[in-house]
Amino acid sequence: RGILYHSIGVNGAMYVNYTDEAYIRQLALLKPSLLIISMGTNETFGRRFNTDEFSGQIEAFLALVKKELPNTAILLTTPPECYRRVRSGKQRTYVRNDNTERAARAIRNVAKKEEVACWDLFTTTGGKNSCRKWHSSRLMGRDRIHFTKEGYQEQGTLLFRAFMESYNNR
């Protein structure tokens, strides 16, 4: 008994990349008790991010997961706020990626609709304008999108606390 941890991740992955029956059938071979899905950031960098389309991609993914893993608990996480790089003349600068807030809201809504758990990392890390604090605290990397090692450790601590709080309140 105990915890068997398995991580699957690909740089730049999006929900649409994992919405594949063959992939989900392979995932089912692991017989997970809990599946934690932490995606959504990459979708927010598209030129025409659309929350309805994004929600549909999550719903399609969840439909496959529920079909192939009917006894597996599912936890969706929302993306934390991040920056995006923009050009201003010859200069490159960073601005808040407003789409992460929209993606977080969409994930929360889909989780409620699909009756799966959701951990709101966007709000937990401070919500709107939190990327400034995470970056100045050196918890966000140079790209201003991904966390540093310390940032990911903090994310893990926050998730652990949320699990324990939920467990203690059952």
Q: What is each PLM-predicted segment?
A:
Residues 1-60, 67-68, 83-85, 99, ...:
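Conserved SGNH/GDSL esterase-like catalytic core that processes O-acyl groups on lipids
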Residues 6, 75, 117-119:
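Hydrophobic/aromatic beta-strand patches that form the interior of the parallel beta-sheet core
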Residues 37, 76-77:
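Structural beta-sheet core signal
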Residues 58-63, 104, 108:
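Generic structural signal for well-ordered alpha-helices
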Residues 69-73:
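A short helix->loop->beta-strand "cap" motif at the edges of active sites that frequently abuts
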Residues 81-170:
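Catalytic His-Asp segment of secreted/periplasmic serine-dependent ester chemistry enzymes
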